[in-house]
Every structure is written in structure tokens, then in C-alpha cells.
From Swiss-Prot:
Biased composition, class Low complexity, residue ranges: 197-211
Positions marked as site (Stabilizes the basic form of H active site to accept a proton): 93
Function: Hydrolyzes ribosome-free peptidyl-tRNAs (with 1 or more amino acids incorporated), which drop off the ribosome during protein synthesis, or as a result of ribosome stalling. Catalyzes the release of premature peptidyl moieties from peptidyl-tRNA molecules trapped in stalled 50S ribosomal subunits, and thus maintains levels of free tRNAs and 50S ribosomes.
Gene designation per UniProt: pth
Binding site for tRNA: 15, 66, 68, 114
UniProt site (Discriminates between blocked and unblocked aminoacyl-tRNA): 10
Organism name: Acidovorax sp. (strain JS42)
Name of the protein in question: Peptidyl-tRNA hydrolase
The keyword Cytoplasm is annotated on this UniProt entry: yes
Residue ranges, annotated region (Disordered): 189-211
Subunit structure, interactors included: Monomer.
Compartments in which it is found: Cytoplasm
Family from the record: Belongs to the PTH family.
């Protein structure tokens, strides 16, 4: 089961509505769902909340170290409570996924994301879960920094928020450790199409009876 949910972002009102803070938005939504409040915890360099689910403690964390030092916060809490990497989920903004979509994966490279890069370094492994929240790509690599540190257009913000609400449907499965189900829930962005009713078979013509 996932015992530590982390959302990545930058602290401060000037960053609050920027694309790079999509992970913070996800944790805020999860905190509302679990009816807990994030409070400052200096020992873990972040805003922290604890929820009790089926007798187990579950932690929510928003590092307040700025993005590039996120691993300092994640590692401090994970080590204190002896939470292994495979029981950590990090929600973060993802350039390679369009707004309106999210993807769940375990392990892999940091793909240039500085928050993930520092978590890799501080945990000593990449073997943790990520919830990749699509923010789209500006199309030009040189524009990436400006892109992530700017507010999305209102229609894009709506799409990102929709993907956050959709992916939250998976949190009970994440808490239960049913990662296959959680992945299916996150990746299924549209309800399946109803099966098309087969046309009624033409009624067979009555056969002529033998004389």
C-alpha cells in the first residue's frame, strides 16, 4: 500500500497557480478527500498531514524546500517512519503528457524534472511510484522553464484540475496496494462505450411442409 503521498511544487503565493505546482494541487485535493489539514513540520521541511485508514497511518507531504531540494523533505519523513520507496507516491507535473491526462508508473528516469532528480539522489533509488499530471509542452525546449513557472490558461487549468479529480478515484486502490486497479482507474480517461446492440436477426421464412 502507499503510505506516503507527496506532491511537488514551489512554496509561496507567486508560485501557487503555476504549472510546476500541479503536484501541490493534487495533494490539496487528496487532503480534502481524506478530511485532513496540512500543517508545517520543520523536521520534515514541509507541510504534512496524517490520516488513519483501516488502522494504518498514511502521510501527505508538500515539501517547502523549493522544487530542486524536494528529496530532502521526502527522505526525512520516509526515513523517520521507515517507509520504503515502493510505498511512496510522488505526484508531479509532466511535460510529456497533455493537460487533461495523468499516468501512473513505478520507477524510471527523472527525465530532467529537478524535483524527481533530487528525490532519486536522496532516496538512493528511483524505485518509487509517480503520478504524472499532464501540463503539456511549450513545443520548444528553451521555453520549458518559463512554461512550468507560468500559470496555465483558464481552459488548460480546467483540464489539469479535471485530471486531478479523475486520478483521485484511484486513491482507495492505492491505499489498498492494488496498483493494477489504480493504474487502470488513472489511465481510463473516458467511460467505455456502450456495446452496440446487435440488430435483431431477420425472422426465418417458414419452411414449406411436406405434403
Amino acid at each position: 500500500m502507499i503510505k506516503l503521498f507527496v506532491g511537488l511544487g514551489n512554496p509561496g503565493p507567486e508560485y501557487e497557480a503555476t504549472r510546476h505546482n500541479a503536484g501541490f494541487w493534487w495533494i490539496d485535493a487528496l487532503a480534502r478527500e481524506l478530511k485532513v489539514t496540512l500543517v508545517p513540520e520543520r523536521s520534515y521541511h514541509g507541510l504534512v498531514a496524517r490520516a488513519s485508514v483501516a488502522g494504518h497511518s498514511v502521510w501527505l507531504l508538500q515539501p517547502q524546500t523549493f522544487m530542486n531540494l524536494s528529496g530532502k523533505s521526502v527522505a526525512a519523513l520516509a526515513r523517520f517512519f521507515k517507509i520504503p520507496p515502493e510505498e511512496i507516491l510522488v505526484a508531479h507535473d509532466e511535460l510529456d503528457i497533455p493537460p487533461g491526462q495523468a499516468k501512473l508508473k513505478r520507477g524510471g528516469s527523472h527525465a530532467g524534472h529537478n524535483g524527481l532528480r533530487d528525490i532519486h539522489a536522496q532516496l538512493g533509488t528511483s524505485d518509487y511510484w509517480r503520478l504524472r499530471i499532464g501540463i503539456g509542452h511549450p513545443g520548444v525546449k528553451a521555453e520549458v522553464v518559463n512554461w512550468v513557472l507560468k500559470k496555465p490558461a483558464p481552459d488548460q487549468r480546467t483540464l489539469i484540475e479535471d485530471s486531478i479529480l479523475h486520478s483521485l478515484k484511484a486513491y482507495p486502490a492505492l491505499l489498498a496496494g492494488d496498483m493494477d486497479k489504480a493504474t487502470l482507474l488513472v489511465h481510463t480517461t473516458k467511460p467505455p462505450r456502450p456495446k452496440t446492440a446487435r440488430p435483431a436477426q431477420a425472422q426465418a421464412a417458414p419452411q414449406a411442409g411436406a405434403d
